[in-house]
Amino acid sequence: NYGLIDNLTVNENLDIGLAYKKISKKEKEQIKIRYIEQFGLSNSLKRKVHTLSGGEQQRVALIRMMLKDPIVMLADEPTGALDPKTGQMIIQSLFGLVDENKVLILATHDMAIANQCDEIIDLEQYRKVASM
């Protein structure tokens, strides 16, 4: 369920990600709207999470994580329920955060995504297999 609260709306779930940020309400709304538009969820703000598709729920969860502005992000199969085009957009958004001095630890079986990473570690072999 991506850690979302099913009986809340998308908007209410995203507000959780902003709850402890020390910025104005206006700034919070601006940040939230930017991600909502970027991730193609503009028409879903008032929908209850349980009515969303798996891919939509996954995008809401990723937005909520990004709204918390973490230094280290752990993304386990972040594109698993997404179509290829949306998945690539999400990956580019996550990599954009890395460019802002964030750390992204990404677990994936998709080698096309893995090959875009700075380092690849094989968890079965317990070793680094590539460094870009």
Name what the model sees in each region.
Residues 73-76:
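Catalytic Walker B motif of ABC-type/P-loop ATPase nucleotide-binding domains
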Residues 8-16:
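Short coil-to-helix segment of the ABC ATPase nucleotide-binding domain corresponding to the Q-loop/switch region
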Residues 69:
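Conserved catalytic motifs of ABC-family nucleotide-binding domains
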Residues 84-86:
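Helix N-cap at the start of a conserved alpha-helix in ABC-type nucleotide-binding domains
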